[in-house]
Every structure is written in C-alpha cells, then in structure tokens.
From Swiss-Prot:
Residues 6-71 are annotated as: Repeat 1. This is Chaperone protein ClpB. SMART domains: AAA, ClpB_D2-small. The Clp repeat (R) domain probably functions as a substrate-discriminating domain, recruiting aggregated proteins to the ClpB hexamer and/or stabilizing bound proteins. The NBD2 domain is responsible for oligomerization, whereas the NBD1 domain stabilizes the hexamer probably in an ATP-dependent manner. The movement of the coiled-coil domain is essential for ClpB ability to rescue proteins from an aggregated state, probably by pulling apart large aggregated proteins, which are bound between the coiled-coils motifs of adjacent ClpB subunits in the functional hexamer. Residues 3-146 form the Clp R domain. Residues 83-146 are annotated as: Repeat 2. The lineage of its organism: Bacteria, Pseudomonadati, Pseudomonadota, Gammaproteobacteria, Enterobacterales.
Length: 857
C-alpha cells in the first residue's frame, strides 16, 4: 500500500503513532497506537464519528491506555520502530475499503471499519464500548454526506460549518445572547429580504455602535421563539468566523479550500442556514494573493443564485470604500439602513439590558442612572453613537462600583494604617526606660485598644454587608437561570416543567430576592451597591473632562464668588469680569443654550489692559492651570490659504491626515477656553469658519468629522478702537464709549459675525490707582521665584508707589510695568545675589533711598 494515498490527517496520525510507540519503548507500531493518535487528533474525524453513535470517547481512550500499558517494552531500540504485521494488514484492508467506496484517497474513518473486521485487541476494545460494523458504516455515510474522498485535504473540509462558524441560534437557546429591545422595523425589513427568491441577502449598514450585530442576534432569538414567518422557522443563524477561516492557512489555496468547504456544507443544508458575516468588507480582498481569487468573488455565484442565505453587516464608510467599488457584489445585497436610536429608544434598550449588567457587576442599577446615561452621553459624547456609548457608561459605572466593593472601604483602611502606626510606636517605646516614655506607652496602649476595637467592629460590619450583597447575587443568578429554563420548556412544549418553574420556582426566588434587597438597603454604611446618576456623571466627567456631576457646595460657593477670584488677577475691568462670570454660572446651572458655546465674547480695548490675562485667569479658575486653554494667534492667519490650518487640509493636500490646529485641540479637550488673540489681524475668510462655531457650536474638520464646541468658551481679543478709547477716556461714560468703539468694529467685521457674539466688552485704559495693585500681583510671581532660592522678600508701600509710577504709561497699559520691575528690582537684586551681599535665609526688604528702590537685609 502506498502511503501517499492516505489523506493528510491519516498521514499525520501515522507519524504521531510512530512517536507514540517510540515514547512507550514499543518495538512495533500497533493498531492501538494509531487509534490512540487518531482519537487525540485535533480536528480529526474519529472522535466525532464515535460520539455520533453514542460511544463515550473518554472511556474508549482509557481502555486504549490500559492496552498500551500491556504491550511489551524493549529498552534501547534506538528510534528504529517498524509497523507491525497487524497494522500493515489493517492498512491494506483500509485500501480495499476505499477502492470499494470509489475513493481516490484513504481517509482515517475507514481504519475503524477495518479494525472491526480484523481480529485483535483493538477489535475487542471497540466491540466492548459498543461499536458495530453497521453503526460505523451508517455514521461514515452520514458524515461524508454522499461525497467521495477525492483529494488529500478532504478530511479538513468536513464539518466546516462547525469549525468556521458560531451558531447564534444555539447561543440564543442557552440564553447567552443579550436581549434585543426595539429595532422591530429593521428586523422586519431583514426578514422581508430573506424571504425573497433570489438575492435574498440583506446587508445592515450603519454607524459603528448603533446595534447592527444586535439585530442579527434579535433575529436568532425570534427564530427560536417561533416569532418569524413560516419560511424562516427552524432555520439556524451561523456567524462566519473570519479569523478561524484565515488562521493557519499557510499554503496557496488553503484558504479558498476552507471557504469552499463552508459553501459546500451550506449548499447541503438546502437553505436551512442563514450565514451572518460581520464586518462584511473583510470578505473583499480576503485571501487574495497574486492572481488568486478573493473571498468576495467566491461568494458571488452562491449569492446570485439564492443558494446562500447571507446577512452582512458593515459601516457606511467601509461599505462605500469596499463594497460599492465592486458593483457585481453590491447588486447581490439589499441595503438595510440601521439608524442611531433616539434617546427614548436608548433608555428602553438600557432598561432591557439592566438585569444582565446587574448580574455581571453584582450591583443594582437605578432608573435615574439609565436615563442619565442616555441623555448625558447623547449631549456630551458627540463622536460616538447611541446606544453603544450609553451602554459603555453603565458598564464602566458598574465596574467602578464593583471595584470599590471588592477593595477595603476607606474608613477601614484609615483605621488599619493608624493601628499599624501605633504598634510601631509601641515597639519603639517598650525599649525606653524614662518616665515620659512609660507615660506615653500607657496612653498609647489605651488608644491602641480603642482603635483595635473600632477596627474589629467595622470589619465585622463590612463582612456582614459584603455577605448580604453576595446573597442577593446568588438569588439573581438562580432567577436568571430559572427564566432561561422556562423559555426552553416553553419552546419544547413541556407544560409540566413550565408550570413548575413559572408558578413554583420563580415566585419563591422573587420573594427571597425582595427580602434580601430590603435587608440590604437598611444597613449599607460602608458599601455602596447602587449605580445612580451621580456615578454616571462622574464616569462621563472622567472620560471627557466636562464637569457634569452635581455641584458640591464648595463649587457653588466658588462660582458665586467668581468675580472676586478673577479680580485677584485682573485689576479693574468690572464689565468684562461680570460678563464672563455670568456665562459660566449659566452653563453650570444648566440654563445655557445646549446648542451653542458656553459663551462667546469679543474683548476690545488698548494693549496691556488685561484682555489676554483675563482669559488666563478664567482657564486657571475652571481648570487650575493657565495652560488649559487653546490659544491661537490670529496674526498667523493673515493669508487666505492659512485658513485651512484651523480645520485641516482638504483631501489630496499634504497634511490631510494631521487634522486642524483648532479642531484637533477641541476634540482632545472638549471643555476648554479658546482664545483667538488679535482677531482683527486674521484674513476675512477665518470669520466664515467661526460663524458655525458661534451659532451652532459645531465645526466640520478637513476629514469630515464634526467637532463639538458646545462646551467651550470662545474669546476673541482685538485692539480696534483703542485710539478712540485713549482719547475719549474720562470724558464719556462706558455706554457712550462702547457705542463709538462698536461703530469702528462694525466697519471691520461683517454684521452676521458681530450678531453671533454673546457680548462685546470694551476694556478701560488703566489709571495710576490700578498700577499699584498690578505691580503687587506681578511682584508676587518674582517673590515665588526667589523663595525657591531661599530669599524672603517684602516691599514697602513707598517703593511700590515709585515702581507703579515708573511703569505707568497710559498708551501701553500694564506692559511697561514688567520692564520697570526688571530694571528697578530684578537687575539690582541679581547683582547683589551674585556678589554675595544678599544671603539666603535672611529676610530682604525693598525700600526707597534717593528716589531709587534698594534691597536691604
């Protein structure tokens, strides 16, 4: 018999049998060795063949092991192992059986038949476990499905559906799929397309996260519940596993062979299987090498003839990019568009999924949490889709709470640390013999006793609460299993079992759960097991940086005192500070228009009066950092072509992938202060872009993504009309001054731009009385730098006034003050520090001598 006539699987098993015999120190390869390796073979035919006729494969394997142990062992055979006469006889009989069946190659299942026909140990074991020639012959025919073994890889293609697909209907029967709520219209349209005679292949198209895969799972659940038309009853929904299909396909044509095996198996099922291909676009080009055919082209004939019932799912972008380009493939599919559900629909979906997440995280999810997850995610997470983003919020909030429940509560942790600290001190004091130490030791022992008692009481309480939570968890799991059993009994028509579960088991478990939940809600002092809207808001704030959580009292006070906080850094300019403060308060109180930025302001006024400083102060107030603002110098956008830098280059231009300067900054930090400095210096086309931002709080970047500006404060600064402010200051009141300046502004900016700004604020020029306060603020920064080097500096009032006088210039505002500080204070200080006249550690006073500021120690 020629070994090249064996199938690949049979050849591999023979090689394994040889190493098996070698490992057991047997001189010959016996039929038992070969049967043992065939039984252990991954993806082999023997195990499923024996299982199909009711033979326990584990018991059979044990019998073979015992027979192997009884074989004679020969030490030092040096790797020369030969097939025994018995094995050669068995293989010759396999060859005979293959020729009889009309096969070109000998497959491994014929070896079982040959073993039963021959006499020997293997034949006896097979008969002992219940194998007969008739049973095996029938099982082989069933396994082959009337096909001949015409190539060496024939065994690999068998059971292709089992290997390369996941049975969704089976998972639905076992209750492993999440419930599908709503989506009736899409499921109905999918069923309608599946009912067609030809081209009965729907493709679900929608944005990522809208629930395309869930629709197919919903279809599987409807099929097992019998809630489908006659044509779809008792059908199976199988999901194609592209990873398994491609994995390990090393040689050219191996992938195609596997896919062909799947298609052949599907053809044999005669329309009883609906194949679901998730990420359908991966089929286009899958397995394509030079000149080879890709998976998409192999599917086309089966799809066109209606032999293959297929449901695809892909996103809009990928459908356009891959499927639409292949018109022949596109026409074989019928599009079913899956839109994003509304907030109300999302709330219904979340209510349906609630129990699954409660069971997984061992927490209770309240209804306000569900409503908050849907509404807040819809408002604040703009780059993802419902219901996916809302489900993620619930999931993460549950995980966060579970993590807190599993770790030690903070109060207990604090007590434990204190006990350890006291014990360490106790050990140290025991070594001392003086009276003070003894007295301290007595006090310490008393405190330690109290703390240890407190700790043990608290620990008991914690353990009791944890046990109560675990109790409800077990009941919930039992209830879930009872409901799955009820569904299975209903489908199989077992009325006795149904009534037993429905009227006996479930009401009892529900009573237990109600009692346990009541007991749980009474005492919970250390553990929180409820996901509320506060937890959802907290998770969202962590994701986006947008403060949507309920305001703490401290934050409310801070917002009410916002003007005083800003005035610590910005001197004068009451109108500007009030306008900004009111906008932020409106936003945090939830009264601002949700479809516009928090506030948009145009700051007008001469240079050096605090326009940019107010923006920095606002960023510091909101985010505790001056750098937490997006600052764009509009003088960089003077040319028409520079405008594209804000939103990103259009397709085909260099830098298209990088995104825009403004849009990328806001995508990363949706809650920020945007400062457009010196806005009048920008090209007029920039204002066309800003119109959308100011009116709708949105902007589309170069790649077509919508960027959300609804949680930003947009501030533009300009020097327009500053000469008029300088001239008329003092002679006109604020409103008259503002009218004159706005007249100049309206000549430079278009009316539609000015009309969209919340408020234009005119800054006053700074007077002498303001300069002393500004000088003090700027000196504080210098003191901080000196403090790091060990110098404590103070300034007298007289010196401060001289400094303010030196830095006063009505035209340039507060900027000359910086130069005055450098010349009058920093330069002399630097010289004295370097020469050693000022020593660290001693206080330094800045005073006046001969009309000059001097540093003394």
């Amino acid at each position: 018999m020629r070994l090249d006539r064996l199938t690949n699987k049979f050849q591999l098993a023979l090689a394994d049998a040889q190493s098996f015999a070698l490992g057991h120190d047997n001189q010959f390869i016996e039929p038992i060795h070969l049967m043992s390796s065939l039984l252990k073979q991954e993806g082999g035919s023997i195990r499923p063949l024996l299982t199909s006729i009711g033979i326990d494969a584990g018991r059979f394997s044990n019998q073979l092991e015992l027979a192997l142990e009884r074989l004679p062992r020969v030490q030092g055979i040096g790797g020369d192992v030969q097939p025994s006469n018995d094995l050669v006889r068995h293989l010759n009989l396999c060859d005979k059986l293959a020729q009889k069946a009309g096969d070109n190659f000998i497959s491994s299942e014929l070896f079982v038949l040959a073993a039963l026909e021959e006499r020997g140990t293997l034949s006896d074991i097979l008969k002992a476990v219940g194998a007969t020639k008739e049973k095996i012959t029938k099982a082989i025919e069933q396994m082959r499905g009337g096909e001949k073994v015409d190539d060496q890889g024939a065994e690999d293609q068998r059971q292709a559906l089992k290997k390369y697909t996941i049975d969704l209907t089976e998972r639905a029967e076992q209750g492993k799929l999440d419930p599908v709520i709503g989506r009736d219209e899409e499921i109905r349209r999918t069923i309608q397309v599946l009912q067609r005679r030809t081209k009965n292949n729907p493709v679900l198209i929608g944005e990522p996260g809208v629930g395309k895969t869930a629709i197919v799972e919903g279809l599987a659940q409807r099929i097992i519940n019998g809630e489908v038309p006659e044509g779809l009853k008792n059908k199976r929904v199988l999901s194609l596993d592209m990873g398994a299909l491609l994995a390990g396909a090393k040689y050219r044509g191996e992938f195609e062979e596997r896919l062909k095996g799947v298609l052949n198996d599907l053809a044999k099922q005669e329309g009883n299987v609906i194949l679901f291909i998730d990420e359908l676009h991966t089929m286009v080009g899958a397995g394509k090498a030079d000149g080879a055919m890709d998976a998409g082209n192999m599917l086309k004939p089966a799809l066109a003839r209606g032999e293959l019932h297929c449901v695809g799912a892909t996103t809009l972008d990928e459908y356009r990019q891959y499927i639409e380009k292949d018109a022949a493939l596109e026409r074989r599919f019928q599009k079913v568009y899956v839109a994003e559900p509304s907030v109300e629909d999302t709330i219904a979906i979340l209510r349906g999924l609630k129990e699954r997440y409660e069971l997984h995280h061992h927490v209770q999810i309240t209804d306000p949490a569900i409503v908050a997850a849907a509404t807040l995610s819809h408002r604040y997470i703009s780059d993802r889709m419902l219901p996916d983003k809302a489900i993620d919020l619930i999931d993460e909030a549950g995980a966060s709470l579970r993590m807190q429940m599993d770790s030690k509560p903070e109060a207990l942790d604090r007590l434990e640390r204190r006990v350890i600290q006291l014990k360490l001190e106790q050990q140290a004091l025991k070594k001392e013999s003086d009276d003070a130490s003894k007295k301290r030791l007595e006090m310490l022992n008393e405190e330690l006793l109290v703390k240890e008692r407190e700790y043990s009481e608290l620990e008991e309480e914690w353990k009791a609460e944890k046990a109560a939570l675990t109790g409800t968890q077990h009941i919930k799991a039992e209830l879930e299993n009872a409901r799955i059993s009820l569904e299975q009994a209903r489908r199989s028509g077992d009325l006795a079992k149904m009534s037993e579960i429905q009227y006996g088991k479930i009401p009892g478990l529900e009573k237990q759960l109600a009692a346990a939940t009541q007991a749980e809600s009474k005492h919970m002092k250390l553990l929180r097991n409820k996901v509320t809207d506060a937890e959802i808001a907290d998770i969202l704030a962590r994701w986006t940086g947008i403060p949507v959580a309920r305001m703490l009292e401290s934050e409310k006070d801070k917002l009410l005192r916002m003007e005083q906080e800003l005035h610590k850094r910005v001197i004068g300019q009451d109108e500007a500070v009030n306008a900004i403060s009111n906008a932020i308060r409106r936003s945090r109180a939830g009264l601002a228009d949700p479809n516009r930025p928090i506030g948009s302001f145009l700051f007008l006024g001469p240079t050096g009066v605090g326009k940019t400083e107010l923006c920095k102060a606002l960023a510091n107030f909101l985010f505790d950092s001056d750098d937490a603002m997006v600052r764009i110098d509009m003088s960089e956008f003077m040319e028409k072509h520079a405008v594209s830098r804000l939103v990103g280059a259009p397709p085909g231009y260099v830098g298209y992938e990088e995104g825009g300067y403004l849009t990328e900054a806001v995508r990363r930090r949706p809650y920020s202060v945007i400062l457009l400095d010196e806005v009048e210096k920008a090209h007029s086309d920039v204002f066309n872009i800003l119109l959308q931002v100011l009116d709708d709080g949105r902007l589309t970047d170069g790649q077509g993504r919508t960027v959300d500006f609804r949680n930003t404060v947009v501030i533009m600064t300009s020097n327009l009309g500053s000469d008029m402010i300088q001239e008329r200051f003092g002679s006109l009141n604020y409103d008259e001054m503002k009218d004159i300046v706005m007249g100049i502004v309206s000549h430079n900016f278009r009316p539609e731009f000015i009309n969209r700004i919340d408020e234009a604020v005119v800054f006053h020029p700074l007077g002498r009385r303001h300069l002393s306060a500004i000088a003090d603020i700027q000196l504080q920064r210098l003191y901080k730098r000196l403090e790091e080097r060990g110098y404590q500096v103070t300034i007298t009032q007289q010196a401060l006034e001289i400094l303010a006088e030196a830095g006063f210039d009505p035209v340039y505002g507060a900027r000359p003050l910086k130069r005055a500080i450098q010349q009058e204070i920093e330069n002399p200080l630097a010289q004295k520090i370097l020469s050693g006249q000022l020593l660290p550690g001693k206080p330094v006073t800045l005073d006046v001598e001969n009309s000059h500021i001097v540093a003394k120690q």
